[in-house]
Amino acid sequence: MTQAAFDQASDNGPMTPSGSSFGLFAPAVVLLALISALATFLILMGLTPVVPTHQVVISVLLVNAAAVLILSAMVGREIWRIAKARARGRAAARLHIRIVGLFAVVSVVPAILVAVVASLTLDRGLDRWFSMRTQEIVASSVSVAQTYVREHALNIRGDILAMSADLTRLKSVYEGDRSRFNQILTAQAALRNLPGAMLIRRDLSVVERANVNIGREFIVPANLAIGDATPDQPVIYLPNDADYVAAVVPLKDYDDLYLYVARLIDPRVIGYLKTTQETLADYRSLEERRFGVQVAFALMYAVITLIVLLSAVWLGLNFSKWLVAPIRRLMSAADHVAEGNLDVRVPIYRAEGDLASLAETFNKMTHELRSQREAILTARDQIDSRRRFTEAVLSGVGAGVIGLDSQERITILNRSAERLLGLSEVEALHRHLAEVVPETAGLLEEAEHARQRSVQGNITLTRDGRERVFAVRVTTEQSPEAEHGWVVTLDDITELISAQRTSAWADVARRIAHEIKNPLTPIQLSAERLKRKFGRHVTQDREIFDQCTDTIIRQVGDIGRMVDEFSSFARMPKPVVDSQDMSEIIRQTVFLMRVGHPEVVFDSEVPPAMPARFDRRLVSQALTNILKNAAEAIEAVPPDVRGQGRIRVSANRVGEDLVIDIIDNGTGLPQESRNRLLEPYVTTREKGTGLGLAIVGKIMEEHGGGIELNDAPEGRGAWIRLTLKAEGPKAEPTDASTKATGAATPAAPAASAMARDAAADSAARGKNERT
């Protein structure tokens, strides 16, 4: 829109007030409606001589409803005019609505408060009549009377059962001497305070009646449910309008004969019961009509509120017309500025006073905005170009990059940092880095007080049970301001450190194996030659001679096996894989360890067969190392807390993997630096070589599997899990079909011989290695 078009659209003249067409009619209607609303409120509150009867309430409701309709028509006409003006593009329509809304809010709040106060006053008055305490009193009075009657019913039940038992024993008297029987019946009735006692038949005819002189004769009711009575369960009869309670029970050993008794109830209690029941019925009837009264008053309050609200809206509509003429031009110009047209100018009329100054200020503002927009657009293009370049660099680097503000809160987190820390950007943003990664607190504090621009160091993080070592560098952002941020970079050097340690220890192992292995063969050959050449010539202490030579040979073998471990770790042979049965390997290994450690209970749960491709010798070595470590860990537990040593070996197939779990109740694994136990020469035992788990880990890695170190699920101990690829179709985990507890499984003679040798070696060495 050009400036000329804007001036033409904005200079259409002021809006004329609607009062010119209505004259004094509209203000008079508003005034009368407000007077009617006030009078209605005073009548309802009881502040006038007029009693708010049903007829009065209906009358004032109709009068106020008519006032609401007239006011609605007047307000609707004004709103229609505003809508018509808005359709023509006049911005003043919005201002009209806002001013009307302001008037409505200002008026509706006190109207609502008055309605709420009146409603609360009415509710408080009704609540005093229908409070829970009043309801409880009325209901309790009925309950007390009914409880009294029920108590009589329970008492008469016990009396009739006792009396029935006594009369059953008197059957012979009944058949031989009816006169004496009647005397006994009368005495029984008098003794139990039963003024009515008689023997009746099923057809309700009376056979015998007790002669209790009370001046009243009891009649058997025709609706007595005599057929429902049993010898152990009498029928209790409570007539509605009578002043007694009765009961009937069949007599055992009597032919079609029933005992019917009755006891009087205090007639005042019966009268009270009827009175309380009638009172309760009247009370509930009043309570049912309570809602109607509340609805009528609520409608009246709503009508009063509508009158006040509509009157305020009408006043707001007319008052706003005198304000919108000078403001309309500013609003229209502001709309053009919002659409991006900063060349618009508002005409200035000095007669408008302060609004003219506002228009002049508006024109200055648009001029400044136009200049600043051009500068901002230029700077935005430069910043956007740098942002895209920075995002591309951060997303492509392998190191984790974290940006911090002056309060050490995270502002930037690239994908590598999310992956290394196991956090999402949503979880980490705007949180303190020391809170997200507490291990960096020391470096952050050092960087804050350091003179150099960057500080670096290594930290160890444990996430999901895994320890990782990171090289961390904290760099201070250069800024002329006193407050500045930091850039933190993280590099995962765990594998690098592990590879360096493994390489260094492999070289050490190779040298140790070379230096120790050379003298072993001559020592062993010399001991065997001594035994073979001089054994038959030794006649004295021959047993000691054989024991010494055997010990030398066995110890040389132990040292040789230790050297073999060094050599195996230094030069681990490539596995020669072929199809094998893992279940058979586990059973044989468990059998050997069970014989070598009879003090430990070995539980094995393995399927009948688990085919896989692996090197039989290497996997057997790995299982033996794990089981030996478990047994020695149990031996390391102090005897007073050890209890029964137990090792559980289970295996099953999960998907495409074979999973072998070894759980013991030994000393367990350390919580800190647990993953370092898989590195060479890292051990928690004084005499341990630190190669057992390292060799196991290497064997599993060569087979495409892995090893996990966990705590035992129950109590103390360790849980080692070995995984390697299975052979054959994928299967779900199967229940173990082989389970042994302490007893040895059948094995070949060669296996038994190996087991005996292993047991002897274990007893001789007495090693205590746990890695």
UniProtKB/Swiss-Prot annotation:
Q: Where is the composition biased (Low complexity)?
A: 740-763
Classification via CDD domains: HAMP, HisKA, PAS
Domain named PAS is located at 386-458
> What does the function comment of this entry state?
Member of the two-component regulatory system NtrY/NtrX involved in nitrogen level control. Probably activates NtrX by phosphorylation.
**Gene field:** ntrY
The residues covered by the Histidine kinase domain are 511-728
Which Gene3D superfamilies does the entry link to? 1.10.287.130, 6.10.340.10, Histidine kinase-like ATPase, C-terminal domain, PAS domain
Q: What Gene Ontology cellular component terms go with this record? A: plasma membrane
Organism of this sequence: Azorhizobium caulinodans (strain ATCC 43989 / DSM 5975 / JCM 20966 / LMG 6465 / NBRC 14845 / NCIMB 13405 / ORS 571)
EC class (word): transferase
Residues where Phosphohistidine is found? 514
Which residue ranges are recorded for the region named Disordered? 727-771
**Which GO MF terms does the UniProt record name?**
ATP binding; phosphorelay sensor kinase activity
Membrane-spanning residues: 22-46, 56-76, 99-122, 295-319
Q: Which terms are listed as keywords in the entry? A: ATP-binding, Cell membrane, Kinase, Membrane, Nitrogen fixation, Nucleotide-binding, Phosphoprotein, Transferase, Transmembrane, Transmembrane helix, Two-component regulatory system
Catalytic reactions on record: ATP + protein L-histidine = ADP + protein N-phospho-L-histidine
Q: How does it sit in the membrane?
A: Multi-pass membrane protein
SMART domains referenced in this protein's UniProt entry, alphabetically: HAMP, HATPase_c, HisKA, PAS
Subcellular location(s): the record lists: Cell membrane
Please name the InterPro entries in this protein's record.
Answer: HAMP_dom, HATPase_C_sf, His_kinase_dom, HisK_dim/P_dom, HisK_dim/P_sf, NtrY, NtrY-like_N, PAS
The protein depicted here goes by the name: Nitrogen regulation protein NtrY
Q: List the disulfide bonds.
A: none
UniProt EC number? 2.7.13.3
